[in-house]
Amino acid sequence: MASKSVVVLLFLALIASSAIAQAPGPAPTRSPLPSPAQPPRTAAPTPSITPTPTPTPSATPTAAPVSPPAGSPLPSSASPPAPPTSLTPDGAPVAGPTGSTPVDNNNAATLAAGSLAGFVFVASLLL
């Protein structure tokens, strides 16, 4: 009788591990582009601490012009709109990966049916 209970416990462990392995979860996120190799970092040169002489102002500052120069665009004119750009870079897939996602699969129903069948089978072994 002890060997039968060991077999039943092993079978229950197998059912539990398979149910955990088949449970839907978030898909792993990976970038479709390879990661670029980073160049080795070099130490930045230390700046010298010699004081820089301050230039003496030789000319008086001039006032800013009040009106824009002739031929320049007026501030009220709007720039043309930017051309439309795609949201995905060139060469990237338009849609997501072709694997199943948690939204569009029915693993939950299959998992529940398989678990119920497993429990019924184990219960029939015990009786």
Swiss-Prot record:
Propeptide: 108-127
Reported modifications of this chain: O-glycosylated on hydroxyprolines; noncontiguous hydroxylproline residues are glycosylated with arabinogalactan.
Glycosylation (residues): 24, 26, 28, 32, 36
GO cellular component: plasma membrane; side of membrane
Compartments in which it is found: Cell membrane
Record region (Disordered): 22-107
Protein's membrane topology: Lipid-anchor; GPI-anchor
Major location category of this protein: membrane
Positions bearing Pyrrolidone carboxylic acid: 22
Protein's UniProt keywords contain Lipoprotein: yes
Residues bearing a lipid moiety (GPI-anchor amidated asparagine): 107
Record field: compositional bias (Polar residues): 98-107
Keywords (A to Z) from UniProt: Cell membrane, Glycoprotein, GPI-anchor, Hydroxylation, Lipoprotein, Membrane, Proteoglycan, Pyrrolidone carboxylic acid, Signal
Signal peptide: 1-21
Modified sites of kind 4-hydroxyproline: 24, 26, 28, 32, 36
Keyword Aminoacyl-tRNA synthetase: no
Biased composition (Pro residues): 25-39, 48-58, 66-86
Expression sites (tissue/organ): Predominantly expressed in flowers and at a lower level in roots and siliques.
Family: Belongs to the classical AGP family.
Name of protein: Classical arabinogalactan protein 10
Organism: Arabidopsis thaliana
